[in-house]
Structures are given as structure tokens and as C-alpha cells.
Amino acid sequence: MSGEAEKTERAYVYMVRCAGGQLYTGWTNDPASRLHAHKSGKGAKCTRALVAQRFAYLERCTDKSAALRREAALKKLTKAQKETLCAEWAEKNLPRLSLATRADAAEILDIYNWYVLHHTATFQVTPSSLPEYEDWVDSTRALIPLLLARDGDGKLLGYACAHRYHPREAYDWAVESTIYCAPDARGFGVGDTLYRALLDILDGMGYWNVYALVADPNPASERIHARLGFTCVGREPHTAYKFGWLGLSTWWLPLRRGNEKPEPTHPLTQEQVEEILGRYQA
């Protein structure tokens, strides 16, 4: 099943917050793409005029018919009722960051294997096993903190990490980043929050360069990387076959610049990591 085919099986009702505080209500099969359309002036006339900014409310429905009924019900609410609903949603759904342990491997694996089966964000086609991912969590967090984002009920919304860009010693100051959000968590800032915290940690550890390998095409991933300051420095066509032929693009973010010999990278203390995560708490 391709990522495009998967979208038609999901339906959501949402409210978008505009620059003047107004709320626009609608429904969609793909929250991330719909929010981008609103923000880029390609959505509804109302959000073009009022300047859409972010999701204020997002609710998954069983199908399109249910989403349309829920949309109609939301539109009948008073402004005060809508604001109460949005406040409750924000309290529950805005991300709380923490550090992963081996015990989190099963939840992380559930998110990753969804992308393996349904999306081209990863070129892996065979799902990973829990023992594999328990070992992966241990090896990943041994080098750089593995970050989690959870909602107010403890549901895992996404994770972010980094690993060596290349095993040879001269690459010691370069890492490749990885970030995945749960399918239902895409489009309302989880990825941005995780990624910014990860980049702050990498900067604090003394890394110079962060690279991201992105399936081509993957416009949503390209948007988040461009927004965070990454530059596309190369595209390889026809690199992999998954739901059709795909290219691969390399995105680069320099954390430092210069020609001097770099200082060795170093781990951060628990207190330093917690201070960084605290900057991004809901």
C-alpha cells in the first residue's frame, strides 16, 4: 500500500487558528498536507484572507461521512465552546519530551513499522522485530540521546535521534538525523519540537554537521528541513524502488563553520539534556 493510497482510509475534522485568533473548521484525509495548503494560501478563501497558522484542534473520525457530520457539529458551536474544545485538545495533545529507554522499543517500533509498510519515508520494506529494535534503542542512545514526544495521556507521538554519518574517524563531527511521527500526530508541530530539541543537543555535544537523507519526492519532509535551516546539497534519481521508483536527496545543516581543527565531541550531562528538553515542553 502506498502512502497516497493510505490517505484515503483516514478522515479528520480540524480547526485551524488564524493570525487574528479566528478559528476555521474543516475536514481532510491528510492533516499535514491540508495545513500546508492553508498556510501557503492554497486552502480555503477564509484562511487565505485571515492567514492560517496552526492546528488548534484535530480529531480522527471513522470515515469521510463521520468527519463531515462532526465538521457540521463543530461549526454550530459558539466561539466560547470552540475555544474550550481547543484548550482541552492542546492540554492533551501538545508534546511532552523525554528520553527513551529500552522499555520504549515496542512503541517506537509500532511507529517505524507503520512507515515500513505504508510510506516511502523509509526505504525498508520488511518490518523490523522487537528484539532488533530493543538493540537499536540501546546502541542509538549510547551515542546520542534518543528523544520521545508523548501527549498528555502518555501516547507516543514521535521520536528523533541521530547516528554517525559514516564509520571512518574523519567523520566524527557529522551525524545523520532520524525523525518519525505517529501517523495521527503529523501536522501539528510534533516534528518541529522534536527536531529543534535534537539539534540543540547535537550543538551542545560539539557536532559540526547534520545530514538528513530524504526520499525524493517527499515534500512534507523537505518543508520541515528547509524550515529548520537545512539546504538540499544533492539529489540522486532512481535510487530505490518502493511503491514505484524513488530518488534520494541529501539535506545539510551546519551547526558550526570554520577551518580550524575541531574539538572532540562530548556527551552532555543528564542535567544539560533535561535543561534543553525543558525549553520545548508544552
Where are these regions (language model features)?
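GIY-YIG nuclease catalytic motif and its immediate N-terminal context
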Residues: M1-L94
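Acetyl-CoA-dependent GNAT
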Residues: R17, P127-D184, Y195-R196, P254-R256
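A short beta-loop-alpha structural element at the N-terminal edge
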Residues: R96-I108
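Conserved GNAT-fold acetyl-CoA-binding loop/helix
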Residues: L109, N113-W136
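Conserved catalytic-core motifs of GNAT/GCN5-like acyltransferases
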Residues: C161, Y211-V214, T231-G247
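Glycine-rich acyl-CoA binding loop
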Residues: G187-Y195, L202
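Conserved GNAT acetyl-CoA-binding A-motif
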Residues: L202-V214, E222-I224
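C-terminal "cap" of GNAT-fold acetyltransferases
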Residues: H238-Q281
